[in-house]
């Protein structure tokens, strides 16, 4: 695939970028060079190569999935104006 001057102008218009005629011509060459590099990458044989999620080996550290109350009840109700046994006390609004 190659990029021509018309394609560069169309992309610039779609991106709402003002591009001068000489810049568009320069970008045509740059985009063709980039696409040439991508085509080279497509030619590389990667059969048998396992896909990677990172360039460095990483292990997910796992913890036991244990349900707890968090032991934060006192911290949670500490700033409440009224509490009773770690519950918020609120005025009655429905009769």
Curated annotation (Swiss-Prot):
Catalytic activity line of the entry: L-glutamyl-tRNA(Gln) + L-glutamine + ATP + H2O = L-glutaminyl-tRNA(Gln) + L-glutamate + ADP + phosphate + H(+); L-aspartyl-tRNA(Asn) + L-glutamine + ATP + H2O = L-asparaginyl-tRNA(Asn) + L-glutamate + ADP + phosphate + 2 H(+)
Gene3D superfamilies, A to Z: Glu-tRNAGln amidotransferase C subunit, N-terminal domain (1.10.20.60)
One biological process term in Gene Ontology: glutaminyl-tRNAGln biosynthesis via transamidation
GO molecular function: asparaginyl-tRNA synthase (glutamine-hydrolyzing) activity; ATP binding; glutaminyl-tRNA synthase (glutamine-hydrolyzing) activity
Keywords annotated in UniProt: ATP-binding, Ligase, Nucleotide-binding, Protein biosynthesis
EC number: 6.3.5.-
Signal peptide (from-to): none
Top EC category: ligase
Family: Belongs to the GatC family.
Cited function: Allows the formation of correctly charged Asn-tRNA(Asn) or Gln-tRNA(Gln) through the transamidation of misacylated Asp-tRNA(Asn) or Glu-tRNA(Gln) in organisms which lack either or both of asparaginyl-tRNA or glutaminyl-tRNA synthetases. The reaction takes place in the presence of glutamine and ATP through an activated phospho-Asp-tRNA(Asn) or phospho-Glu-tRNA(Gln).
NCBIfam families from the UniProt entry: gatC
Quaternary structure annotation from Swiss-Prot or TrEMBL: Heterotrimer of A, B and C subunits.
Name of the molecule in the record: Glutamyl-tRNA(Gln) amidotransferase subunit C
Source species of the chain: Mesorhizobium japonicum (strain LMG 29417 / CECT 9101 / MAFF 303099)
Record lineage: Bacteria, Pseudomonadati, Pseudomonadota, Alphaproteobacteria, Hyphomicrobiales
Gene of this entry: gatC
């Amino acid at each position: 695939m190659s990029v021509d001057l018309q394609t560069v102008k169309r992309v610039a218009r779609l991106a709402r970028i003002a591009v001068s005629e000489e810049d568009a011509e320069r970008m045509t060459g740059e985009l063709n060079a980039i696409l040439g590099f991508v085509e080279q990458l497509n030619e590389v044989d990667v059969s048998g190569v396992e896909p990677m999620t990172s360039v460095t080996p990483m292990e997910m550290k796992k913890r036991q999935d244990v349900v707890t109350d968090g032991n934060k009840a006192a911290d949670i109700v500490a700033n409440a104006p009224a509490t009773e046994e770690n519950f918020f006390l609120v005025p009655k609004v429905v009769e």
